[in-house]
């Protein structure tokens, strides 16, 4: 046990986490040079391209240290983005230590801080590492000071390295072995293993990545998953080096995979505890699950519709397959008059939503229309019942509503001092309430309470553009609060288009209605009759634009002549247009649905 070390790497996007992981794997000989490729642990194309890690991965390596002992080190790769913070907390609770990687040229950023605090709360030993010291603009002293000011851990003996060139990587491993404690746990106790991650493999079913805390696990054991009580027979256990290698058993302190013929990913939830099923000789089930398991709840909802309605079944299959690998994705069928059949999907956050969309388009070749993302409102109706509304079309009539509650999140923003004014203006414009403001060295930390609905649309993009990309943020759900929000409907020729409805704050509703209507006017093609585009709140019309009819010049053949002859022809044309308007319907082009997403304040 004393020779095992379990650790993960915490870093902000682009601070070199995956590259450092590559170097450590190479240094310990986990893969031959031929199999080595950049970002070994990021297995999805999107992960590579965006340079982010979404799913947790592991590598079990052996390292011969300078004191002559051979250590087994388990590297558990964690996602870095706030949307996946639950996955991070599970990965961290499987470790005794974490390398805090900070880019020496950029200093500390928000998501690093969020994940680092999570590590400290879980009692994980944090080892600071300064990366990218080969860059000319690297300033290790400033970065050390920032780690001390912002996070509050001692960084005087932080290791410096450059993951790109491989400089100092051995020092990082040595420092980690010296400072991270070996795992505690007892191989003789009843089995308790924490599921760090699970994914679906086409050949063997669900593969669970586990950290064995107590006890041991062999093939042919019967196991029970404690959150839902299902039992399974273990077929294989083993470790990743990042290639999978079967082992005869996994015992306390080790990290490895378990394959037990589970068909549904929903059964093997991240954070759940695996133990032995009762009634096996010499195997006692654990009485208590490991702490910290919670169901992940989606925060953002959007409708996904296939462009061709014939692709509906294909979209359903694609979503089913995606859900095999992403248990936090929820979806249910819904029908829209404008867009036909599709699905209402729930996501952890905006990045998650983008990634799901991208994976559907890339891996499954779908063409999708996405409606504006919404958050879940709690509506207290006049009969006292409470309704959760994740779709504007489900919002009851105004007369039946007592109060509407909206989700509020606490947002931590970090930025260089020169951008504070602009960011504060942005937050105030988004109905934010300032809770706190700290100066930490050259950085400023702002804490705001903001309505989730304001963040969902374009807060992140705006924050990045006004701070030239230097500001970073993380957010967590706080509570539901009463809010004065209304539903804005868009009517085209007096008919409501459900997919274009949005729920906005009353103070912003008229402006929003006008903007959308003006934008739609430019997008809807001219018809043979006038098209009226209106925005309505309840039965009040707040904005209107007309798309003028295309018409033939009926007077072309009249040269000179009597005015009454011309009038007769014009009246006749008018009658025809009127008749057309009664029977004609307007095709709404695809861009119209996207336009809703891009309305500026």
UniProtKB/Swiss-Prot annotation:
UniProt: GTP binding residues: 14-19, 131-134
Cystine pairings recorded for this chain: none
Keyword Transferase: no
SMART domains: EFG_C
GO biological process: one example: positive regulation of translation
Matching SUPFAM superfamilies: EF-G C-terminal domain-like, P-loop containing nucleoside triphosphate hydrolases, Translation proteins
EC number(s) from the headed UniProt entry: 3.6.5.n1
Location(s), subcellular: Cell inner membrane
InterPro entries: EF-4, EFG_III/V, EFG_V-like, EFTu-like_2, G_TR_CS, LepA_C_sf, LepA_CTD, LepA_IV
Reactions that this protein is recorded to catalyse: GTP + H2O = GDP + phosphate + H(+)
Membrane disposition: Peripheral membrane protein
A Pfam family reported for this protein in Swiss-Prot or TrEMBL: EFG_C
The UniProt record lists the keyword Metal-binding: no
Entry keywords, A to Z: Cell inner membrane, Cell membrane, GTP-binding, Hydrolase, Membrane, Nucleotide-binding, Protein biosynthesis
Sequence ranges assigned to domain tr-type G in this UniProt record: 2-184
Top EC class of this enzyme: hydrolase
GO molecular function: GTP binding; GTPase activity; guanosine tetraphosphate binding; ribosome binding; translation elongation factor activity
Gene Ontology cellular-component annotations: plasma membrane
Function: Required for accurate and efficient protein synthesis under certain stress conditions. May act as a fidelity factor of the translation reaction, by catalyzing a one-codon backward translocation of tRNAs on improperly translocated ribosomes. Back-translocation proceeds from a post-translocation (POST) complex to a pre-translocation (PRE) complex, thus giving elongation factor G a second chance to translocate the tRNAs correctly. Binds to ribosomes in a GTP-dependent manner.
PANTHER family: TRANSLATION FACTOR GUF1 HOMOLOG, CHLOROPLASTIC, TRANSLATION FACTOR GUF1-RELATED
NCBIfam families membership: lepA, small_GTP
Family membership noted in the UniProt record: Belongs to the TRAFAC class translation factor GTPase superfamily. Classic translation factor GTPase family. LepA subfamily.
Identification of the protein by name: Elongation factor 4
Native source species: Polynucleobacter asymbioticus (strain DSM 18221 / CIP 109841 / QLW-P1DMWA-1) (Polynucleobacter necessarius subsp. asymbioticus)
């Amino acid at each position: 046990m004393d020779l095992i070390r379990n650790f993960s790497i915490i870093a902000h996007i682009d601070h070199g986490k995956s590259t450092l992981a590559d170097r450590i794997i190479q240094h310990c000989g986990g893969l031959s040079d031929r199999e080595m490729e950049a970002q070994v642990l990021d297995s999805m194309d999107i992960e590579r391209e965006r340079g982010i890690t979404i799913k947790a991965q592991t590598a079990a390596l052996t390292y011969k240290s300078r004191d002559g002992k051979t250590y087994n080190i388990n590297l558990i790769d964690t996602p870095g983005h706030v949307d996946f913070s639950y996955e991070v907390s599970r990965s961290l609770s499987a470790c005794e230590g974490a390398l805090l990687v900070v880019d020496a040229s950029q200093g500390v950023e928000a998501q690093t801080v969020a994940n680092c605090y999570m590590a400290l709360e879980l009692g994980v030993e944090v080892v600071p590492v300064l990366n990218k010291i080969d860059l000319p603009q690297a300033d290790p002293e400033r970065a050390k000071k920032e780690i001390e000011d912002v996070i509050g851990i001692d960084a005087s003996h932080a290791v410096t390295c450059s993951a790109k060139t491989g400089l100092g990587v051995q020092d990082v491993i040595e420092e980690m072995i010296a400072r991270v404690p070996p795992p505690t746990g007892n191989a003789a106790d009843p089995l308790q293993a924490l599921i760090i991650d699970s994914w679906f493999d086409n050949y063997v079913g669900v593969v669970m990545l586990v950290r064995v805390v107590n006890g041991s696990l062999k093939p042919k054991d019967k196991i029970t998953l404690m959150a839902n009580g299902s039992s399974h027979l273990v077929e294989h256990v083993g470790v990743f080096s990042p290639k999978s290698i079967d082992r005869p058993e996994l015992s306390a302190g080790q990290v490895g995979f378990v394959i037990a013929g589970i068909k549904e990913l929903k059964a093997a939830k991240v954070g759940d505890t695996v133990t032995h099923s009762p009634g096996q000789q010499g195997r006692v089930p654990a009485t208590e699950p490991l702490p910290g398991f919670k169901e992940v709840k989606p925060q953002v909802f959007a409708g996904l519709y296939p462009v061709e309605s014939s692709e509906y079944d294909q979209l359903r299959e694609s979503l089913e397959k995606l859900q095999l690998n992403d248990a936090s994705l929820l979806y249910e069928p819904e029908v829209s008059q404008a867009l036909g059949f599709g699905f209402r999907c729930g996501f952890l956050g905006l990045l998650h939503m983008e990634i799901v969309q991208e994976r559907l388009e890339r891996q499954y070749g779908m063409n999708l229309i996405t409606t504006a993302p919404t958050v879940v409102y709690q509506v207290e109706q006049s009969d006292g019942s409470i309704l959760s509304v994740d779709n504007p079309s489900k919002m009851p009539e105004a007369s039946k509503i007592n109060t509407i509650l909206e989700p509020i999140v606490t947002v931590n923003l970090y930025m260089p001092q020169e951008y504070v004014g602009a960011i504060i203006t942005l937050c105030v414009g988004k109905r934010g309430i300032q809770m706190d403001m700290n100066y930490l060295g050259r950085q400023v930390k702002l804490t705001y309470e903001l309505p989730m609905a304001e963040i969902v649309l374009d807060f992140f993009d705006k924050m990045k553009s006004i701070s030239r990309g230097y500001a970073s943020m993380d957010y967590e759900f706080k509570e539901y609060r009463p809010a004065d929000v209304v539903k804005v409907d868009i009517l085209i020729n007096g008919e409501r288009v459900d997919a274009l409805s949005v729920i906005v704050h009353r103070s912003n509703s008229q402006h929003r209605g006008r903007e959308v209507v003006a934008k739609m006017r430019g997008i809807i093609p001219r018809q043979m009759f006038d098209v009226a585009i209106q925005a309505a709140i309840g039965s009040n019309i707040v904005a209107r634009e007309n798309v003028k009819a295309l018409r033939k010049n009926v007077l072309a053949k009249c040269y000179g002549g009597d005015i009454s002859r011309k009038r007769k022809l014009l009246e006749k044309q008018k009658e025809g247009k009127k008749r057309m308007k009664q029977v004609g319907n307007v095709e709404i082009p695809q861009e119209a649905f996207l336009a809703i997403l891009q309305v500026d304040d």
